[in-house]
Amino acid sequence: MTELFTLKESVLFYLDRSGGLQKLVDDCKLLNDPQQVDAVYRFKISVNPSDLIELDPVLGHCVLHDPLRATVLFQSVCFLAIKTLSLTEKIQTASQVNVTLIFTNLPPFPEYTLDLCSFPRVYGPMRPVSMEGVVIAMTRITKYTQGARFLCTNDDCPCSTGFHHIRVHAPGATESATVRNDFICMICSSQLKEDVKFRVLGDKQLVELIHVEALDVLRGHRHGSFRYQSVTLFLRDELCNSVRIGRLYKVIGIPALVHQWPNMTWSVEANSIQLWEPKDCPEVSPRFQQLLNWTASSPWRFSAIVAHCFGLDLAPPALYNTLKLGLLLSLVQTRTDADDSFHSLDVLVVTSDALILDRLMTFSLSLARRGIRHQASGEMFTSLSRDEHGAGTANIHAGSALLATGGICMLGDLGCYKKDKLDHIQSVLESHSVSVFIPGKKYGEDADQQLSFPVQCSFWGLTHSSQCSGRTDSAVLGTAELGPIPAQFAEAFGLVIQCGDRVGEQAVHAQSVHTLQQAMQPGTQPYPSHWEFSTQDYKELVAHCQNLQVELSPEAEKLIHGYYMASRRARTQSQGVKISLASIKLLLSLAEAHCKLCLRTRVLEEDAVVAVLLCENSVTLKHGASALIIPPDAVFPCDMGDMEGLQRRDMILDELHQNILRFIYTYAPGADTYIAEE
């Protein structure tokens, strides 16, 4: 008895010191509405286990290892405070006080952490644990009984009136544990009957969580044998709609075995949820630091060498430099800001040889923080099933695009997709959201419902180009053959890169020699170079670049704005093509990404030049050449295997820079007022 009194005294002292007592007073003021009379009143109390242990170790141990008993202690103290301070007349018994303890954190020890990869999961003490995982499925919000009032059927029993028999939901309890018709009065043993008009309902949502490493299997390759299994979270009341499919969360919850005869399900009652993103910002490797110092005299050389040396195990140098640069820019630019705004850069590759490029894109996918390789036979966005935990509502499962949230979704060969699937992908590319239709009759609802989910990933696609008779290679690249995909689809993609059609037999021979060398001497470096970088070096570089915060210089902004206006007018006059506002976003994304890849924090005019060249090549592939005459591989116009080649490339890019300025002055009158002539 003395120990119980001491614990309650510690609870009262903690509530007073932490502000919980004042919050109780404020919450009770909201209950004084005479129109609202309930059987149970819910109070949320935030508890910090570290502070509790410091105040009273016994109470801290009770909260961490026996939360149900701790809840009863807080309930008793809260009821005593309500009656002593006369906070409300609506609460007559302690049973009407429904206290929910919200954990702010847990001690950073293994016994308070649940690894979602650990097996088997057996019944243990119902105490809070912390876990991290990705949301892969969620249900619609349904109702559950938060609390109910029962009256004794014996009129002579004092429990036939008042609020003596109150049942509230407890973690791990089913609906039948809270409300059913076989409860017995504690005083006279007569049957109890629910007073339905006092039933209090709350919101409930089921969510499936899985270890983030499980998504590595979907990159297209896997190492070792692992077993991954999702865990079901029960979200209640204010936690409903607090998560999004595809996002990574840190959850504090209480594991429980839910009995639904004849089955028994292991699940977790969520207590608190917070968005969790690993804040890793690795340093750039010494090799890249050395390269950065060596190329400091030119704003273009660092990114050129980084792209040139990328993926040498899969393709010989100089063969797909533009594509490799585009993939690196997409990796760097794909990120979510602190304000939850998402930045993406979609890449569509047009080629006549898809095998090598598919391998190169798959290898690039391994550098992404999260990368999903979609199978044409699988679900791209969402799928529906019936919930298996008794709710009977629709369970929405994430497809490849939603699982790739914050990363890259690789579509592979678009020739494998049917027209309706391509139309759906095009719609998502344009709106960055996907709608899910839920038929009400099928899933136990009165009305149909349509939900919308944001799609926050970059898409990589591949299409075979058709060979046109009579077509010859020239310095000016015309409209590309996009194979089975419509022109509107390519327009929605943004950046389009053509590979393989102009390099001819020489490139085929180089690729064949490279493949044979790698097969006969795997792991060796077939092209000795002063600059050699490992896959880990590239992973660290991409991760570091993603975290860089950049600002747009006035010179870069003016060049981008001037090119957009000039290109829009030139193409409208000569081709009747209207350049959309999406081109501005593409130009800014390319310029920012190139700035980051060069490890700068200020977007220079030279970054804007690279963005303009890539964008102009992309628009040319879709709509044909314009008055701005640039070579097909404008960013890599010459071989750069040595210092002389790098210098020659700088000179060509300087000339192209001047061509862009002349194009702007010609087709955007007035541009000379804000762009300084060089």
Language-model-derived ranges and their functions:
Residues I560, R569-K585, K596-E678:
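C-terminal engagement/docking regions of AAA+ P-loop ATPases
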Residues R149-L151, L248, I252-W294:
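OB-fold/S1-family single-stranded nucleic acid-binding modules
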Residues I102-L106, R222-Y228, A296-V306, A556-R568:
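Active-site-adjacent bridging/hinge elements
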